[in-house]
């Protein structure tokens, strides 16, 4: 209902139903006749007391809309943001007040979420493996999902809110975010994030889709070369007890919104500088990793060469052992015959040479 009304307001270029809403709020549907002219008492006669006005004959400016804006905001603060968004249909003055309250409500719920998230993070351990098993793990997951929703809503609405073309329209979304945050703060063992955030995801997605499809095309036609800087700047003040509160004063009360935007821009710049530093560190780490990989490849190549050398040495040792065995067998066989005593010194010399070569090869292998 509030979204359809916002679309109609955007097409007409103004909010509410005009200044005549204050007369409707008075409760009198018929025009009262003017009071009779006072009769001057005759000389010597006693003056009669003037009759009191009936409740339906009170001045029409004695209504809710005619109260000061601070009083109206104090009264509306007891209502939900969904009801406040629907009260924009009353009149232009009520539309101005409700717009300010909706914009401030979105900023307040962002600050409340930041406070809750800071409190939960302060109690969580620093290690990621310990966080998963912590009792506040689900609290952190829910708050992270709410942060994503707030970022999407901020990107969708706040561009046009800062341009004073509209306000934060879906008040029901603010109520739902407050409900989720209070549930997280008051529950020790909450449900899973997708169960808690199902309603918030549904209504926020519908609100953003409707805004992009129905209202953004109308607002975009007002963006280029438009002299209208928003209802809060261009609407004349409604006469009443708070007429001294001019439009510029109304706009000055929205300066916290621009301060928040400036703070966010500074935070974005700080985050950008941090990202640049992290990228530089990542590039340095990648260079170190490449150097380590190159050293590992060189070590693998050397290991392969050493393995080949050891294999060749083992083959030579096996061959020398085989020759030594043959020499020893032949020496033993020849020593048994008497006719071959002349060749025994030569055989012994060969055996001695074979043993020496075997010892040298073993020494070489030990050095490797």
Curated annotation (Swiss-Prot):
Effect of substituting residue 66 to P: In DEE100; uncertain significance
Biased composition (Low complexity): 22-31, 42-56, 333-342
Keyword field contains Phosphoprotein: yes
Biased composition regions of type Basic and acidic residues, renumbered to the chain: 1-11
UniProt biased composition (Pro residues): 32-41
Phosphoserine modifications at: 235, 242, 344
Annotated region described as Disordered, given as residue ranges: 1-56, 328-368
Record-level GO BP terms: protein polyubiquitination
Molecular function in Gene Ontology: identical protein binding
Annotated CDD domains: F-box_FBXO28
Keyword Endoplasmic reticulum: no
Keyword set, alphabetical order: Centromere, Chromosome, Disease variant, Epilepsy, Intellectual disability, Kinetochore, Phosphoprotein, Ubl conjugation pathway
Phosphothreonine: residues carrying this PTM: 270
GO cellular component term of the entry, any: kinetochore
Chain ranges of the F-box domain: 61-109
InterPro entries according to UniProt: F-box-like_dom_sf, F-box_dom, FBXO28
Subcellular localization, as worded in the UniProt entry: Chromosome, Centromere, Kinetochore
Amino acid composition bias (Gly residues), ranges on this chain: 12-21
Domain of life: Eukaryota
Function description: Probably recognizes and binds to some phosphorylated proteins and promotes their ubiquitination and degradation.
Subunit and interaction comment: Part of a SCF (SKP1-cullin-F-box) protein ligase complex.
Involvement in disorder: Developmental and epileptic encephalopathy 100: A form of epileptic encephalopathy, a heterogeneous group of early-onset epilepsies characterized by refractory seizures, neurodevelopmental impairment, and poor prognosis. Development is normal prior to seizure onset, after which cognitive and motor delays become apparent. DEE100 is an autosomal dominant, severe form characterized by global developmental delay and onset of variable types of seizures in the first months or years of life.
Protein name: F-box only protein 28
Natural source organism: Homo sapiens
Gene that this sequence comes from: FBXO28
